[in-house]
Swiss-Prot record:
Listed name of the protein: Large ribosomal subunit protein bL36A
Any one of the GO BP annotations: translation
Entries under SUPFAM superfamilies matching the protein: Ribosomal protein L36
Family: Belongs to the bacterial ribosomal protein bL36 family.
InterPro entries: Ribosomal_bL36, Ribosomal_bL36_sp, Ribosomal_L36_bact
Coiled coil: none
Superkingdom, taxonomy of origin: Bacteria
Gene: rpmJ1
GO cellular component terms, semicolon-separated: ribonucleoprotein complex; ribosome
Statement: the UniProt record of this protein carries the keyword Ribosomal protein: yes
A GO term, aspect molecular function: structural constituent of ribosome
Amino acid sequence: MKVRASLKSLKDKDGSQVVRRRGKLYVVNKRNPRWKGRQG
């Protein structure tokens, strides 16, 4: 999982979902887990 300042490029990937957990923004991608990320 990458920690990024901006999730814009990750959320545009095919199969990505933006999720908010414990006040942090995450991108999860079950099709291609390589594109997982957290903002901050």
